């Protein structure tokens, strides 16, 4: 599984698109050019409550395209919505509305379950949360930090990549 593309959309705005390739992708650049926004948009599409960018820019939707061995998954999430719309080519997977978290009253499938299943992880799945062996439900965002590495070295005056 890998992220193919992240798109930020807004009414009357030109889509802002970043495409990725399979393997390691490095997002680098000067300060205040949107690197952190890319990571926040991916996190938001997968369930973060925090808006990925300031609404004053005129954008209000994030679309994340994911390639999996079983097919493609396209996740659309509007700002201030606790659900996503999924379009997928994965056989036996549902297109339509997905909830972001498991609750007692879910009416829709859970996004994380779809993504974990495409990775070969049966759901529901629990993992150990702490030294007392308390368990918690496994979500895709549980290990998002292993899929995306964010490196910040704010004090560095000279870029290690650019001359």
Residue ranges of predicted features:
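Extreme N-terminal "head/tail" segments of very large remodeling/mechanoenzyme assemblies
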Residues: 1-75
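Extended, charged alpha-helical "arm/stalk" segments used for dimerization and assembly
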Residues: 79-163
């Amino acid at each position: 599984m890998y992220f193919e593309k992240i798109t930020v959309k807004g009414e009357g705005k030109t889509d802002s698109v970043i495409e990725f390739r399979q393997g390691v992708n490095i997002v680098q650049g000067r300060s205040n050019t949107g690197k952190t926004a890319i990571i926040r948009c991916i996190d938001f599409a997968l369930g973060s409550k925090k808006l990925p960018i300031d609404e004053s820019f005129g954008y209000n939707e994030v679309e994340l395209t994911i390639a999996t061995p079983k097919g493609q998954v396209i996740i659309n999430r509007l700002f201030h919505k606790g659900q996503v719309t999924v379009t997928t080519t994965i056989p036996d997977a549902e297109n339509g509305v997905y909830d972001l978290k498991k609750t007692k009253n879910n009416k829709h499938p859970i996004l994380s379950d779809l993504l974990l299943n495409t990775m070969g992880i049966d759901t529901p799945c629990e993992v150990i949360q702490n030294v007392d062996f308390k368990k918690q439900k496994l979500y895709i965002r549980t290990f998002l930090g292993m899929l995306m590495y964010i490196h910040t070295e704010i004090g560095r005056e000279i870029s290690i990549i650019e001359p």
